[in-house]
């Protein structure tokens, strides 16, 4: 069988080896002379020093692991020769010498590598600047442990870079991010994760950017100040404490947005103080107004809670056709009436997390929390045609809300209900039928129940 496989063309064998880990692919070099240099035809090299800690043989010393890893990387790069590399991934937590790391990076850069993915323990040392001078890189990922420091004279254009991911990266000063982004004229996707205190004041100004993901959640340190000057952005995924500020929000052609504000006890107390609360909510309003052109919008429970505090200043979402609301038992729905009124073209509404929420007097007609004669007409005026309920548990309160939606959403044509897996057994259904809503009459609405309430 080995001989039959060995007769295949080199490029085909290289493709087969690329389906293995780099460590497994390198081991095939001992099969025969034919296989010795086939690693050169593998365009994807991925090195992870954790693979050298074999639990079956007992943990090596840190120094032993480091040296074994170094020898392996050196050997593979030597066998690879001058062959082109498409992807180079390096996960190194054992403290390899910085000069050696730089040597490996320069090696793959000289061979026109397209994708580099780095995560390493540099301590207080700064990583090599050569990586920011590549004219071939299409995607760059810098993960935990990477520390960046360079001056204007150390960075040239990264003309081919399309995707940049920075996760838990630290910087020598607050202007580093802007300098890096200014060198990426073709960047289309930017991912900033675990921002913390790395760049408390940052401006993302990229005309070519299409997708932006920011995860900025730190329970300590100052609030962040983000400016978005991305007129051609299509997709925004933003997670942050809602105390952040947004001096500039230029998102004119935004199509899809996910806004996830994180609430803490400290922030809830601050909002309760009128002066602090008004200031923080005015900052939130800047971002919400900036995304008002979206067609598809996702709001987390925390975001829904925050919007309830400033619902009177909520903008009109003239283009919005698809809205996802994630709820929870401790979240009030006071934002829902205004939100639904301000979506004149809404076609699909998805409610995740079930329908049970914190009872409040200001939910209007969005729910059945409190019974009163006049609660508004936000549902009746909403043009939504399709309603989807996720994590439905079948409580009496939820059953009443389904009935409420059925009769109050006047344009409704279809309702899909997804029963939550593992729902508590004490939640007895109102009917043993697979569809307990057949008794609802008078409307031409299709109701589909996914999962069992029995």
Curated annotation (Swiss-Prot):
This is Putative F-box/LRR-repeat protein At3g58880. Pfam families: F-box, LRR_At5g56370. Gene3D superfamilies: 1.20.1280.50, Ribonuclease Inhibitor. The keyword Cell division does not apply. Coiled coil: none annotated. Residues 2-48 form the F-box domain. Transmembrane segments: none annotated. It comes from Arabidopsis thaliana. LRR repeats lie at residues 77-102, 144-168, 169-194, 214-240, 270-301, 303-327, 328-353. It comes from the Eukaryota. Keywords: Leucine-rich repeat, Repeat. InterPro entries: F-box-like_dom_sf, F-box_AtFBL13-like, F-box_dom, FBD, FBL60-like, LRR_dom_sf, LRR_FXL15/At3g58940/PEG3-like. The keyword Aminoacyl-tRNA synthetase does not apply.
